[in-house]
C-alpha cells in the first residue's frame, strides 16, 4: 500500500536535520543512522549515509537514481552463503 501524496515521504526528522545542516555548510561527512525506513529525497543526493544492517553501518553514497527508495533497500541484512554441494563420492 502506498503513502498518501499529501503526507509526503517519510524521512526521520534527525536525519533530515543533519542533511540540511550539511547542505547549508556545504560539507560532505558520513551520516550514521539506524533509520532504514527513511525515504531518499533529492536533498540527500551526493551525501554518504551509513545505514545499520543489524551488525554494522554500511556506507552508501546517494545518487539521483536512488531517490524514492528506502535506505534499508541498499543495506542488506542477510548473507546467502549458498546451498550445500551434493558430494556423490562421499556417499558410497
Swiss-Prot record:
Compartment annotation: Plastid, Chloroplast
Leader peptide range in chain numbering: none
InterPro entries: Ribosomal_uS19 (IPR002222), Ribosomal_uS19_bac-type (IPR005732), Ribosomal_uS19_CS (IPR020934), Ribosomal_uS19_SF (IPR023575)
The keyword Transmembrane belongs to this UniProt entry's keyword annotation: no
GO terms for MF: rRNA binding; structural constituent of ribosome
BP GO terms, sorted: ribosomal small subunit assembly; translation
Keywords: Chloroplast, Plastid, Ribonucleoprotein, Ribosomal protein, RNA-binding, rRNA-binding
Main location: plastid
Protein name as catalogued: Small ribosomal subunit protein uS19c
Native organism taxonomy: Eukaryota, Viridiplantae, Streptophyta, Embryophyta, Anthocerotophyta
Originating gene: rps19
Amino acid at each position: 500500500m502506498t503513502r498518501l501524496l499529501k503526507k509526503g515521504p517519510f524521512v526521520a526528522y534527525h536525519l533530515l536535520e543533519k542533511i540540511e545542516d550539511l547542505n547549508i555548510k556545504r560539507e560532505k561527512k558520513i551520516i550514521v543512522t539506524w533509520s532504514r525506513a527513511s525515504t531518499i529525497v533529492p536533498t540527500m543526493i551526493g551525501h554518504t549515509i551509513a545505514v545499520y544492517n543489524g551488525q554494522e553501518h554500511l556506507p552508501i553514497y546517494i545518487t539521483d537514481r536512488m531517490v524514492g527508495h528506502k535506505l534499508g533497500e541498499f543495506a542488506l541484512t542477510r548473507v546467502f552463503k549458498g546451498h550445500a554441494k551434493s558430494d556423490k563420492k562421499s556417499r558410497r
